[in-house]
Amino acid sequence: MKGCSSYLMYSFGGLLSLWILLVSSTNQCTVRYNVADCSHLKLTHIPDDLPSNITVLNLTHNQLRRLPPTNFTRYSQLAILDAGFNSISKLEPELCQILPLLKVLNLQHNELSQISDQTFVFCTNLTELDLMSNSIHKIKSNPFKNQKNLIKLDLSHNGLSSTKLGTGVQLENLQELLLAKNKILALRSEELEFLGNSSLRKLDLSSNPLKEFSPGCFQTIGKLFALLLNNAQLNPHLTEKLCWELSNTSIQNLSLANNQLLATSESTFSGLKWTNLTQLDLSYNNLHDVGNGSFSYLPSLRYLSLEYNNIQRLSPRSFYGLSNLRYLSLKRAFTKQSVSLASHPNIDDFSFQWLKYLEYLNMDDNNIPSTKSNTFTGLVSLKYLSLSKTFTSLQTLTNETFVSLAHSPLLTLNLTKNHISKIANGTFSWLGQLRILDLGLNEIEQKLSGQEWRGLRNIFEIYLSYNKYLQLSTSSFALVPSLQRLMLRRVALKNVDISPSPFRPLRNLTILDLSNNNIANINEDLLEGLENLEILDFQHNNLARLWKRANPGGPVNFLKGLSHLHILNLESNGLDEIPVGVFKNLFELKSINLGLNNLNKLEPFIFDDQTSLRSLNLQKNLITSVEKDVFGPPFQNLNSLDMRFNPFDCTCESISWFVNWINQTHTNISELSTHYLCNTPHHYYGFPLKLFDTSSCKDSAPFELLFIISTSMLLVFILVVLLIHIEGWRISFYWNVSVHRILGFKEIDTQAEQFEYTAYIIHAHKDRDWVWEHFSPMEEQDQSLKFCLEERDFEAGVLGLEAIVNSIKRSRKIIFVITHHLLKDPLCRRFKVHHAVQQAIEQNLDSIILIFLQNIPDYKLNHALCLRRGMFKSHCILNWPVQKERINAFHHKLQVALGSRNSAH
């Protein structure tokens, strides 16, 4: 016994140790949706306890030196294996043999130095192979010959001196070949012959010290759509040579960023004449001279980036030939400002005249003095123009500033950060289709008469935030009734309290920002007519006096009529009162921000109409009490609540309801444990609100409600019981009558046997008068009923006992008329009852009906007749009623019993 116990303890200890080992090993990796993440775990070997059905395994940033094929036998379903950022120096060919479904293999940032013919011989299903940042200096033989499905191959940041990756045509499905940051000096046709049947979407040779492009080097590639040669330090001569080598190829995208291409001429891109080049990136080249006709051979170009250059001048023929250009970026493309005015960049009139299909023009962050009368002439398709921080001398916008855009269908104009101080009347009269006008972050200080916006008949948004000073008038926005968004944040706004309101014409306005203006005086009709307003930002003003009861004329309800308001921000307004009815009829409010005010006691029912509220912010106020009368309605559908940093009074009267709500709600309450603290009473100071014990709170309201509900339920129950006791039989009678009038009395009997009598009646001799008196009329009323009565239906000349047996067999049912006489009748007790029961037992049928004319206890019934009420279904047990009015109900129940099916037990 002792040995057995020791063995069990040893086994249990071993299993426990194994379980701990498995859990600790598995728990290091995160497994989710067949993806195992084992990165950053300092692993030195492949985990062997992961689920066998994983399809993705991440082993990056560990200390692996090898990928032993046998360790992957368990994971034969792997499709993606990422082993980057390890110390792997050799890859065994059998790895892909073990992983036949492998499609993506990432080995970047390892220590691979050479690749043999056998390395990837079994990796026939690979679509992506990443060998970036290894120590591969030379590719020998044909290591990628079997990779017929490979789409992307990354060999960037190695030590390769040649583009030759094999002999003979291979990699037929390759689309991306990345060879950036190697030591390739020349592109030779014989070294690119292996790509003879490839259609390269992208060939990246960036950051290589290229010095030579041999004749036909790109012609040997099947198809080449995109070539990246960024940071290759190509001089103008090499660039021109490159373009000639790309002639008659499929090239569409050419990136030559950061190549110190100081100047371009008509011959620079002439070799691209016989291509369909659509994208050209010349950014970061310190380009200072764009010669006339530089792009004349690029009629298919749609995207041109000249960002971050040092262009001194654009002439009328600088963009000649770009008849299909859609996107042009000149962000920070011009010479930066210096002391000498002569060094300012110059854009001649009609410089953009050839760009008739240009839709997007970005000229941000330049130092152009200002616009001229024909600066943008010819841009007849321009829709987006960004001029942020573009001009140095555009302090005043006049009706001549944008005259060159008169024929442009401009939709968006960005003029931020240009030191604009004044907008003259009719400045934008040329821009009838403009939708968005951004004048923010300037130095505008003026009174808005409304004529500034003349001609903006389709304007959707005007952004004027972060300017110096704006004074409104009643007609400030009278000419832009289509306006839907108006931003006036931090503009030292004046004259807001005039009547009629400056915003009255803006019937379509949905967003209005008046924040950070120190507004103290407004009228009740400030927002009159803005029925479509959805967002109102009024934070960081000084509205405290306007909502005080002591305010002359009473509180100012400037929110009335905003029936579609969704978001209201009144943060930091010094509010210490909220008048009753100020939020009335604002049924669609989803978010209210009243944070950083001085609110303390809130009136009951002020939020009653805010049952759709999703977010409520009351942080950093002086709220001590959170009561149901105030916060019950808005808390119903709340998703987010912020009441941090309030001095809560932790008493039953003040916060018991709030604490109960907190402990039951799913609403997001950030920093509940740390920033919802009790302030009073003293012994609760600093105590977390959610830990306040409400069990001792004696709130009578719930008990009153419980008393009312329980009392009502008890009264209803008593009434129902009395009704059933007094009139239950009548209810049952009418119910049964209704049911059987619809469905009929007889149930479907599946037995094929036919009976001559509906029922054989067993009764005592002394009860024969009662039987004849009540069963005979039933036969007369219902012709389908026929009872077997001894005095009438026994065959003449047949012995009595034999007649009884025959009659019972020919009857569908057997009725017992039970009285004290029956219990004493010797014939019934000895023969009739026993034979009837025996037949019922033999046939296994519910064919017996008991009619009690007298109240006979069950034990007497059992003793005399060997019967009990529990042997029969309830509808087969009938009691003769004392009251005459219940006789009809009795007859109905008897008909139901007679019509019931003789179902087997």
From Swiss-Prot:
Q: Which PROSITE patterns match?
A: LRR (PS51450), TIR (PS50104)
Q: In which tissues is it expressed?
A: Highly expressed in lung. After intraperitoneal injection of lipopolysaccharide, highly expressed in brain, heart, kidney, liver, lung and spleen.
Q: Which residues lie on this side of the membrane: Lumenal?
A: 26-705
On modification after translation, the UniProt record reads: TLR3 signaling requires a proteolytic cleavage mediated by cathepsins CTSB and CTSH, the cleavage occurs between amino acids 252 and 346. The cleaved form of TLR3 is the predominant form found in endosomes.
Crosslink position(s): Glycyl lysine isopeptide (Lys-Gly) (interchain with G-Cter in ubiquitin) = K766, K813, K832
Under Gene Ontology molecular function, one entry of this record is: pattern recognition receptor activity
Could you tell me which residue ranges are on the Cytoplasmic side of the membrane? 727-905
Membrane topology value: Single-pass type I membrane protein
The record's PANTHER family line, in alphabetical order, gives: TOLL-LIKE RECEPTOR, TOLL-LIKE RECEPTOR 3
The name under which this protein is listed is Toll-like receptor 3
Species this chain originates from: Mus musculus (Mouse)
Give the gene symbol: Tlr3
